[in-house]
């Protein structure tokens, strides 16, 4: 349960208590239950229509939130995962392969978080090593060779900052991905499904179209990190989350991303099938527009998109 959901939890407890009492004592409490369920629905809508940035940060980090592989199973047909960077090893924190979107062959890549403690250790909590980014680039170049559109799912706190990752060239692997992705001659569509953290997110995020789920975040640093750096107090992370403009609605307004995909009431984890359906519709729409461009036009479109991000004022 998240902090802002406490009022909902209290109503749910009352509903459960009434249902238990109704069953145990063989009394009719359905009218009271119906009233509370209606109240729960109203309160849920009220809370989720007025989420604050820090609330969305909590939702983006939720363990129950659907992962890249969850969405792949719903959206793409006959997906085959491909492994390894052909240089060092396979990285379970970065998954990728080929499948079909509406009958069209495509390449799909994304960071993969774990579902539980054991899986998170195996997936390194979705924080890829250099070999993960090199695997992603290998699959992108393969997609370009065979003319397949590329879809990437961004879901990471950041690239893994460990000693071994740095020794194997973490920053170089990400930098190379940025350069190579900028010039790909096939459509590239990226979607932030949870946290989009810093260079770790950008390493698979240089796309013609960048989309975000309604309760995802995209930032150069975590709110806690920003608060610690700016104000020497990580407890000010709520203020940092608001100041940094890291939520999907804010980034859409700032023209850093192209579109926001709405989530089911309560978050993507409440109805994965519905969320996947909305993502598939958005992917199909964006791809149909990008397929009107030739290879060089796609590369130029991508380059110009990122050139236009940001502004400054002279005084």
UniProtKB/Swiss-Prot annotation:
Gene3D superfamilies from the UniProt entry: 2-enoyl-CoA Hydratase, Chain A, domain 1
What pathway does the annotation place this protein in? Answer: Lipid metabolism; malonyl-CoA biosynthesis; malonyl-CoA from acetyl-CoA: step 1/1
Print the organism lineage.
Bacteria, Bacillati, Bacillota, Bacilli, Bacillales
The residue stretches assigned to a coiled coil in this entry are: none
Q: Name one GO molecular function term.
A: ATP binding
User: Know the name of this protein?
Assistant: Acetyl-coenzyme A carboxylase carboxyl transferase subunit alpha
Q: Indicate the family of this protein.
A: Belongs to the AccA family.
Q: Which UniProt keywords apply?
A: ATP-binding, Cytoplasm, Fatty acid biosynthesis, Fatty acid metabolism, Lipid biosynthesis, Lipid metabolism, Nucleotide-binding, Transferase
The organism's superkingdom is given as Bacteria
What organism is listed for this UniProt entry? Staphylococcus carnosus (strain TM300)
Protein's gene: accA
Q: What are its E.C. numbers?
A: 2.1.3.15
Function, please?
Answer: Component of the acetyl coenzyme A carboxylase (ACC) complex. First, biotin carboxylase catalyzes the carboxylation of biotin on its carrier protein (BCCP) and then the CO(2) group is transferred by the carboxyltransferase to acetyl-CoA to form malonyl-CoA.
Which subcellular locations apply to this protein? Cytoplasm
Question: Reaction(s) catalyzed by this protein?
Answer: N(6)-carboxybiotinyl-L-lysyl-[protein] + acetyl-CoA = N(6)-biotinyl-L-lysyl-[protein] + malonyl-CoA
The record's annotation in InterPro entries points to:
Acetyl_CoA_COase_a_su, ClpP/crotonase-like_dom_sf, COA_CT_C
A GO CC annotation given for this chain: acetyl-CoA carboxylase complex
């Amino acid at each position: 349960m998240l902090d802002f959901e406490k009022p909902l939890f209290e109503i749910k407890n009352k509903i459960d208590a009434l249902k238990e009492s109704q069953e145990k004592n063989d009394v009719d409490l359905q009218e009271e239950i119906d009233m509370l369920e209606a109240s729960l629905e109203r309160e849920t809508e009220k809370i989720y229509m007025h989420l604050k940035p820090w609330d969305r940060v909590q939702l983006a980090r939720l363990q129950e939130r659907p992962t890249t592989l969850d969405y792949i199973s719903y959206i793409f047909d006959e997906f085959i995962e491909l492994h390894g960077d052909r240089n060092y090893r396979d990285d379970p924190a970065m998954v990728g392969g080929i499948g079909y979107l509406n009958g069209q062959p495509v390449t799909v890549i994304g960071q993969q978080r774990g579902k539980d403690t054991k899986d998170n250790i195996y997936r390194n909590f979705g924080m890829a090593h250099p070999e993960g980014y090199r695997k992603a680039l290998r699959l992108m170049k393969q997609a370009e060779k065979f003319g397949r559109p590329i879809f990437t799912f961004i879901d990471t706190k950041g690239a893994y900052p460990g000693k071994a990752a740095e020794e194997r060239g973490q920053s170089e692997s990400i930098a190379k991905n940025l350069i190579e992705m900028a010039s790909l001659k096939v459509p590239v569509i990226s979607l932030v499904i949870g946290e989009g953290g810093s260079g770790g997110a950008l390493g698979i995020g240089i796309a013609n179209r960048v989309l975000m789920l309604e309760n995802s975040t995209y930032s150069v640093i975590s709110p806690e990190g920003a608060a610690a750096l700016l104000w020497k107090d990580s407890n000010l992370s709520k203020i940092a989350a608001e100041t940094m403009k890291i939520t999907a609605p804010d980034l859409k307004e700032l023209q850093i991303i192209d579109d926001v995909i709405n989530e089911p009431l309560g978050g993507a984890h409440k109805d994965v099938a519905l969320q996947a359906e909305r993502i598939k519709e958005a992917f199909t729409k964006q791809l149909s527009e990008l397929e009107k461009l030739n290879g060089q036009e796609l590369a130029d479109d991508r380059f110009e998109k990122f050139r236009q991000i940001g502004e400054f004022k002279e005084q």
